[in-house]
Structure formats: C-alpha cells, structure tokens
From Swiss-Prot:
GO annotation, biological process: translation
UniProt-recorded Gene Ontology molecular function terms: large ribosomal subunit rRNA binding; structural constituent of ribosome
Full protein name: Large ribosomal subunit protein uL10
Lineage: Bacteria, Pseudomonadati, Pseudomonadota, Gammaproteobacteria, Chromatiales
Cross-referenced Pfam families: Ribosomal_L10
Annotated function: Forms part of the ribosomal stalk, playing a central role in the interaction of the ribosome with GTP-bound translation factors.
Family from the record: Belongs to the universal ribosomal protein uL10 family.
Length: 176
C-alpha cells in the first residue's frame, strides 16, 4: 500500500523530531530477518529506550537533514532499520551489537555520534561506552580513592603503635 503525501510528511517529521533529540544513530541492514526476529528486535529496543524504525531511504534522508545525523544521508541505501539512542549514546549500538551476535543477517552499515559518521567497526567501541550512571560511579570511585588511602594511612599509625607495644609485651612475657 503506497503512502500518500500526508503520511510521508508525518513519518519525516516524526523521525526528524527523534533525530533532533537523539545522542547517536545506527543504521543496519535487516535483509533476511524474519518478522518474528524483527518483532523481537523492536521489543528489545522499547526496553532499552531506543527508537527503532524502518523507513524508506528517501524519507530517512529528508528526516535526518538538518540534524547531527545529516552525515548519514549518502549511506542510506538498501533495506535499513534506523535506531536512535534517546538517553544513552551507546544504547542503540549495544542493542544492535547484541542482536547481531544472535542473528547474523543483521548487518551494521552506518554509525553516527555527535555529527560524525563512524565506520561499522566503531560499533563495538560505542557499545562499550558506559552508561551515564556507570560513568558517574566510575568518576566517584576515582575521586574517592585518595581519601580512602589517606584514611587508611592515618589509621595505620595507631595500629602500628599497638602492634609494637604488643610485641614488646609478648617479648617481656616470654623472657619472664
């Protein structure tokens, strides 16, 4: 069933709005995936807060025009599914990477972050980025480490004194 002009405009505006607020985008070729597998991918995308959509390439080119993902326009060829990360820059990459491990027919074509077009090989690097919460906890651990070491050092002085006095006591008791 062909789309009329109003439907096309609605799709373009919806994808453009999502692309304008997204942190990263991944385009993957889904040729050979069954309907069940695509439904499974969509369900996982909803759980990860990733916007996933199959859009005609001409409409996708119009939708990403004027956004950070305009660099993807030339590469939008073939049957592609677009995944946009809403909260976490690595969410779409993790979703596609994990799904592609199980389903070899899902092939990554384009990866884009912050207006830069990355190769399909960069998907692994983007997917391994920590989430916001993980990054904050790593930063806090790094900031807390010197304080912990300082506290242990201060605690060591009285501990060493106690061990020395105990050793002298044991030595005197042994000689007596």
């Amino acid at each position: 069933m062909p789309l009329n002009l109003e439907d096309k405009k609605a799709i373009v505006s919806e994808v453009a709005a999502v692309a304008a607020s997204a942190h990263s985008a991944v385009a993957a070729e889904y040729r050979g995936l069954t309907v069940t597998e695509m439904t499974e991918l969509r369900a996982k995308a909803r759980q990860s807060n990733v916007y996933l959509r199959v859009v005609k390439n001409s409409l996708a080119r119009r939708a990403v025009e004027g956004t950070d993902f305009a660099c993807m326009q030339e590469g939008l060829v073939g049957p592609l599914v677009l995944a946009f990360s809403q909260d976490d820059p690595g969410a779409a990459a993790r979703l596609v990477k994990d799904f592609a491990k199980e389903h070899k027919k899902l092939e990554v074509k384009l990866v884009s972050v912050g207006g830069q077009l990355l190769g399909p090989g960069e998907l692994e690097r983007l997917a391994s980025m920590p989430t916001r919460d993980q990054a904050i906890s790593l930063l806090m651990a790094v900031m807390k480490a010197p304080l912990d070491k300082f506290a242990r050092t201060l605690n060591e002085v009285p501990g060493k004194l106690v061990r020395t006095v105990a050793a002298i006591r044991d030595q005197k008791q042994a000689s007596a």
